[in-house]
């Protein structure tokens, strides 16, 4: 998987966001289109699905970022619906549709994609149902890279007016991160992942990289790495069997998937808070 290197400043954007209800049991509300900004210079509007818990108040929130194959609607159904039922506002971003992209698994992500998490964050902090001090980013594969890029001390994080308070990255590519994370960060990956190897994430977490550069002891915020035994890339996505995708092995692992639900819920509860965690499984 190829990902963009240097980052450039992203343009302003128009962001139609589809909203829905949160609880699994009641029927979902009819999605509503929300227009965020209408600058004349906008060339890549941002869109997505937004869910909110029932009831008044200001809720913690999570921005969800999809992988290099898009599928943001499936991500909303698979993870955002669940997280919203825990008591969080969720915003699942579609980075590809407005850009006319279908897949960036071999071509690499556009450089301005790295700012999409903050474009979503800037929208959420304006919502009366969101607590602006309790917003996390959660991404998968390429979206995991975007998540880590968003909270790594560097040009993206430092140029942002508002900040994330926590970050979760599922099986991200961990190469090329040379600086510290600025918020509590959780990385979840599979022991047998042959696309974004766990060993690369372990090196990053331990402050080592392939350039021989190590983070200074005591700097930044600690990163927690969880490696699921026997799990491959995309272990949380239910599929009928193993798949070969661009030469990489993808396979659902129920044990790892169920455990990741608990791990994410516990981490979010500890960092930005909502309902107290209880055991849950993938259906």
Map each language-model feature to its residues:
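Bacterial N-terminal signal peptides that target proteins for export
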Residues: 1-11
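Bacterial N-terminal signal peptides
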Residues: 9-19
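N-terminal cap/lid segment of alpha/beta-hydrolase-fold proteins
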Residues: 25-57
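Short substrate-entry loop that stabilizes the transition state in hydrolases
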Residues: 55-59, 64-102, 176, 194-198
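Primarily recognizes the serine-hydrolase "nucleophile elbow" in alpha/beta-hydrolase
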Residues: 73-75, 86, 117-182
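Short beta-strand/loop motif that positions the catalytic acidic residue
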Residues: 187-189
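Active-site-adjacent alpha-helix of alpha/beta-hydrolase-fold enzymes
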Residues: 191-245
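Catalytic active-site module of serine/aspartate enzymes centered on a nucleophile-bearing elbow/loop
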Residues: 244-283
